[in-house]
Amino acid sequence: MLPSLQSLTKKVLAGQCLPEDQHYLLKCYDLWWNNAPITFDHNLRLIKSAGLQEGLDLNMALVKAVKENNYSLIKLFTEWGANINYGLISVNTEHTWDLCRELGAKKTLNEGDILQIFIDLKFHKTSSNIILCHEVFSDNLLLKKVNNLKMRIEIFWELREIIEKTDLLNNEFSLNTLLLKYWYAIAVRYNLKEAIQYFYQKYTHLNTWRLTCALCFNNVFDLHEAYEKDKICMDLEEMMRIACIKDHSLSTIYYCYMLGANINQAMLTSIQYYNIENIFFCMDLGADAFEEGMALVGQEGYEPIRNILSLKIYSPATTPLPKSTDPEIIDHELKNYFSKNMMVFLTYDLR
């Protein structure tokens, strides 16, 4: 729809960085949401207000306004360029549905529309967005229009490491449960602290899932928060196994090692999952399970790892890492870490 002169004026005003003593102007123009002024980043198409410091994409802001039956903001965001069809995903009253139709929305969303809206809305990895996605899509009857397999493929792709190598997420779960675990996992993967706390407080039965995601996605900060502060427990060797699922998971491997997990077992798990950087890191920490590793790679397809393990050139790193489970220290030490034994292998291979 074509924006009115008034909505264009509001758009310009919302793009200004007004001092606090001029916020009354924004309130006069209905640029007010959750008892705070609305600002609009024109380039990023982000709406910001109280509780939305990270901002919401314009389409997601419309979804939230529709969910809250905020008619003035529904009209405003639509005039600013939001896709009114997105509002149908969260409409919950007949009056709001009628308003969306007046503003140009389709009579109904088809499967392709719903799936595309789901893909678009989950794109922005912020706490505000992930929490709202959870609230909007949880028990949403419109999802019944979407082929169940298509939805599951969208969820499984981003969580494929956990799905392939643990039994904590599978096709036996309902779509609603899968979505809940998906949003929680995304919050942990991207260290969205506000969203993590939201899910932790609301879904205590998923504490093990939180710990699993922190281990698998190498989030040593939330791992420490969950294990040390929130006292979420798991068998130490199982923690190390999960940490070795993905390659480049040095921080969570080291954290588990500092807790006392077996570094030789970590090396063998990394071999099993074909995670070469993890293997060299375990060697740096003193792992020497070469014979067991060679037995493990006896099967076809492990030739590069067999070549690595066959050489008698490795030894523990001479400069030890700090003996600490402080996530800040671990992250600082390992952010730009390059394995001493990997360097030995690479230079040996070049001779």
From Swiss-Prot:
ANK repeats lie at residues 57-89. It holds the Pfam family ASFV_360. Keywords: ANK repeat. The keyword Plastid does not apply. The keyword Cytoplasm does not apply. One of its GO terms (biological process) is taxis. Plays a role in virus cell tropism, and may be required for efficient virus replication in macrophages. Belongs to the asfivirus MGF 360 family. This is Protein MGF 360-12L. It comes from African swine fever virus (isolate Pig/Kenya/KEN-50/1950) (ASFV). The lineage of its organism: Viruses, Varidnaviria, Bamfordvirae, Nucleocytoviricota, Pokkesviricetes.
